[in-house]
Amino acid sequence: MANERPTSQQRPAGGPRKRRPFQRRKVCRFCAEKNLTIDYKEPRTLRYFITERGKIVPRRISGNCSAHQREITEAIKRARNLALLPIASNHTLP
């Protein structure tokens, strides 16, 4: 079939299959430290969750749990609406 995995005979010459390096599971910093809060009025906290292009960092990269990722997304969108965070990449943070 077309969707089968390649066997060792079908793999190109070059040795055995390479393994991915082990990465430790990221822990949600808001679950780990209960005193941290997510607030749209704190752009310095939210800055860690947006890229230099102004996009929201996904959960698999930031390590947040799904509940806190939703809160961060809402807070970033509110801060953008109030011009506390940049919408595009050519704006600078205060």
Curated annotation (Swiss-Prot):
Matches recorded under Pfam families? Ribosomal_S18
The keyword Ribosomal protein belongs to this UniProt entry's keyword annotation: yes
Q: Which InterPro entries match?
A: Ribosomal_bS18, Ribosomal_bS18_CS, Ribosomal_bS18_sf
Q: Which PROSITE patterns match?
A: RIBOSOMAL_S18
Keywords from UniProt, A to Z, are:
Ribonucleoprotein, Ribosomal protein, RNA-binding, rRNA-binding
Care to name a GO molecular-function term for this sequence?
Answer: structural constituent of ribosome
Q: Which residues cross the membrane?
A: none
GO process terms (BP): translation
UniProt GO cellular component terms: cytosolic small ribosomal subunit
User: Which family, according to the similarity comment?
Assistant: Belongs to the bacterial ribosomal protein bS18 family.
Share what the entry says about its subunit structure, partners included: Part of the 30S ribosomal subunit. Forms a tight heterodimer with protein bS6.
Name of protein: Small ribosomal subunit protein bS18
**Species:** Pelobacter propionicus (strain DSM 2379 / NBRC 103807 / OttBd1)
